[in-house]
Amino acid sequence: MTKQELLKTHFGYDTFREGQEAVIDALLAGKDVLAVMPTGAGKSICYQVPALMMKGITLVISPLISLMKDQVRSLNQAGISAAYLNSSLTQGQYFTALRYAKAGRYPIIYVAPERLTTEAFLDFALSADIFMIAVDEAHCVSQWGQDFRPSYLKIAEFVAQLPKRPVIGAFTATATKEVREDIARLLNLRDPFCTTTEFDRENLYFAVKTPKDKYKEVHDYILEHPDDSGIIYCLTRKLVEEVCGKLIQDGITATRYHAGLSDEERRNNQDDFIYDRCHVMVATNAFGMGIDKSDVRYVIHYNMPKNMEGYYQEAGRAGRDGDPAECILLYSGKDVVTNQYLIERGQDNQEMDMETWRLVRDRDQERLKQMTFYCFTHDCLREYILKYFGEYGKSYCGNCLNCQTEFEEQDVTEEAQAMVQCVKESGQRYGVNVILDTLRGASTAKIRQYHMEENSFYSVCAKTPVYRLRQIFNYLVLEEYLSLTDDGYTIVKLTSTSRDLLEKGSMLTMKMPKAQELQKKEKKVRRRKSSTAGELKEQDEPLFQKLRALRTEIAREEKIPPYMVFSDKTLIHMCILKPENEAEMLDVTGVGRHKFEKYGKRFIDAVQNL
């Protein structure tokens, strides 16, 4: 079969996405490849198609067990024989899989990097006809990458032992220039074909918010989107437990994922999410790499991540089916402090000497600063992301909160000076909420406990809305007029430049959003409209729900996630085309020959018998 025929038969697509065909052609021509393609751009097809066209085995080196299982299950659903070799297999299962591999049963084999150096796998590899090695999540080889894994450094050594050097393809979703250079060098790529596809994901809506009550923001959002799947990312395990526990207590079916859970619990919780038994996943960044759930409609970051690379990779897990999805970041000053603490804790990594650790720490601090700037910019959020990765987009995308908000330059000198004076008079001993509650004249338990009613600046900003005070405070932290430290809990401190703000004649202005409350209401209307994916017409909604129910029924029968039957995008296209026969069903995006033979008649019957 040609590459186009393979694409349609097994994957159900009529055309390749941007960048895919050029990568496939390079690999088929025997050239090494370094491909940087954002999450959702279809990296896996770039090595799966050549693997099916060429004689020999393709080894896919992958860092996570969950990633391998998900990919192999998807391939098997598409009628492609594939297997994985990792620590989740019993000894008997492992050697059976190796025996089948030697017999040529699997054109594609996923393997953990730790397995490359084991005696049993080396014996297999030395006698096998390996056409290609695809290194997934290739940024893991670089100590400058956000997920450095020392086991990836063994890949080049493994390749050097093979009797015949295979073609090598390195794939990653996010990589700066330094990381790309590291990947090419550490994997010993030979004159590679390098490509970086456009990072922009036009279907994703970006927003940064600074709510006083993050949990309420998340809770209310989920209630507005009861049928949508979403991920809530938290910085720490403790927060994951806290947020997930509250959601369950409030009647929301949520589950959780972090490294502190047992393997079995993580596996069960992950399955609950991908099988749609549970719509909300609360997790640390340990969750998501390689999880091919295409219908995630929102990703909410409960905290600001450490860097833009991690943020864009995690946010990119929304809307992989191409339909509208939302990426919302909830910022607070404490997030900066927590991330600084996590960066400093990197010193505990025994695999790095002190000099290397310092270099990594300094780089991480710079990345954190760039991430913080993202949270404060009033320019287009999409443009900020693209610029960070070396691309230049429009200065107005129309699909982020900043582009949908009108800003104006406002004088905030009076409020800013009051904040600095309040911190100074109170002895630099309190957190953000105590300072802001003092300025607005609140009478909370802590205000009374600390006798803040006696502070000279108590209630001087009583007429200023609390959201505006919070925006001004965050701006003062960004401009380093105030700082936050972690002395058990977050404390507001003065800086060496605090005094400048108090000098006679000093003035501070900042961009502030206009008519904020009105925009909030408009945003909620926009959300509801975008939640029903794609071009679905109102009269087709009953058919769409019927097809989703059939998909769930089939998924339960076959014990697979619903999105592996057909994606929402495919079901929507069925609602539009309303196929009556095989030829018409094969015109539906995402329906290939193999899946038609398995499911086609049942879906045609469902369409015709509404």
Language model: regions and residue ranges:
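Helicase motor core with emphasis on the C-terminal RecA-like subdomain
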Residues: 1-10, 14-18, 22-44, 51-54, ...
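Accessory DNA-binding and partner-docking regions appended to nucleic-acid-acting proteins
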Residues: 1-6, 337-338, 349-353, 363-365, ...
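Short, charged low-complexity linear segments at domain edges
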Residues: 359-389
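Flexible coil/turn residues that form the inter-helical turn or adjacent wing/linker of helix-turn-helix
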Residues: 164, 226, 378, 428, ...
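Short helix-to-turn junction characteristic of helix-turn-helix DNA-binding domains
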Residues: 27, 222, 273, 375, ...
